[in-house]
Amino acid sequence: MQTRNTFSSIKEEITRSISVSLMIYIITWAPVSNAYPIFAQQGYENPREATGRIVCANCHLANKPVDIEVPQAVLPDTVFEAVVRIPYDMQLKQVLANGKKGGLNVGAVLILPEGFELAPPDRISPEIKEKMGNLSFQSYRPTKKNILVIGPVPGQKYSEITFPILSPDPATKKDVHFLKYPIYVGGNRGRGQIYPDGSKSNNNVYNATAAGIVSKIIRKEKGGYEITIVDAANGRQVVDIIPPGPELLVSEGESIKLDQPLTSNPNVGGFGQGDAEIVLQDPLRVQGLLFFFASVILAQIFLVLKKKQFEKVQLSEMNF
């Protein structure tokens, strides 16, 4: 009986330990692993709002450039490259979730016209595969194959991302036509400042929640600070919690105002969006254009030959 109770106790301890470990893992790493563009996928049915704004800007507050390059025109059922460039200073280091410094990651969302989608592996040429590297793209939703996301991936290696795209064929997709279409892109480097629930990340400026005198600053063992602010008028105390990462700007005994920055801004990244246009070209129109050019060239040749023939006739008449 005692052996059975001992076994039950050991089993309970093991179960409790596993549960605690799992909770610690979720609390510690969830903000890191659920990085862009996963947040957008979880919170928004469509990444592009009616205003044209891409929702990634809700969490990545700094504005940074992004560039996209696509062919001017493509034929139906053809694989082509969409190259997204996310430039930034490779020497920069960002504040990680644990407060330490590390390299920047990048991510991108590519919003293609309806019918355009990620090219299947067997249609991608070796040249494009080499440019892609080890990237793994995914659809924003199973029902939205024209919206592709990637990231976070190391910015040092993938500040230029090549998407392999398959153009649609109007012969098999009746809702697709030979037209000029817009393509939208959003790209960011570095961690965001706001989580989807509205809470601030440690990649942010922290401001004073009250005015008064900084009476005490406690540096936490695992990083970060507890700042006690005392209102000189009524003696009320307010404690502001600063997570690991941002650098402190105030000191004990200093008089501060409401919303005054207590820390520096550690953010070195940001988000940008852009657009491009692509024409889905009708092969018959291309053939017609080539035929027209060929006919013009032939007409020019015939005119030159006719002119030379006429000159020979004139020359022979003059000699006669």
Swiss-Prot record:
The UniProt entry, under Pfam families, shows: Apocytochr_F_C, Apocytochr_F_N
GO-annotated cellular components: chloroplast thylakoid membrane
The entry's keywords: Chloroplast, Electron transport, Heme, Iron, Membrane, Metal-binding, Photosynthesis, Plastid, Signal, Thylakoid, Transmembrane, Transmembrane helix, Transport
**The keyword Transmembrane helix belongs to this UniProt entry's keyword annotation:** yes
Instruction: Classify the protein's membrane topology as the record does.
Output: Single-pass membrane protein
Could you tell me the superkingdom of the organism this chain comes from? Eukaryota
Residues spanning the membrane:
286-306
Q: Mind listing the GO biological process terms from this record?
A: photosynthesis
Compartments, as annotated in UniProt: Plastid, Chloroplast thylakoid membrane
Tell me where it mainly resides: plastid
- Tell me the InterPro entries matching this sequence: Cyt-f_TM (IPR024058), Cyt_f (IPR002325), Cyt_f_lg_dom (IPR024094), Cyt_f_lg_dom_sf (IPR036826), Rudment_hybrid_motif (IPR011054)
Where is the secretion signal located? Answer: 1-35
User: Which annotated residues bind heme?
Assistant: 36, 56, 59-60
> Is Nucleotide-binding among the key words of this record?
no
What cofactor is needed?
heme
Q: How is the cofactor bound?
A: Binds 1 heme group covalently.
GO terms (molecular function) for this protein are: electron transfer activity; heme binding; iron ion binding
Q: What does this chain do?
A: Component of the cytochrome b6-f complex, which mediates electron transfer between photosystem II (PSII) and photosystem I (PSI), cyclic electron flow around PSI, and state transitions.
Please report which protein family the annotation says this sequence is part of.
Answer: Belongs to the cytochrome f family.
Q: How is the subunit organization of this protein annotated in UniProt? A: The 4 large subunits of the cytochrome b6-f complex are cytochrome b6, subunit IV (17 kDa polypeptide, petD), cytochrome f and the Rieske protein, while the 4 small subunits are PetG, PetL, PetM and PetN. The complex functions as a dimer.
Record protein name field: Cytochrome f
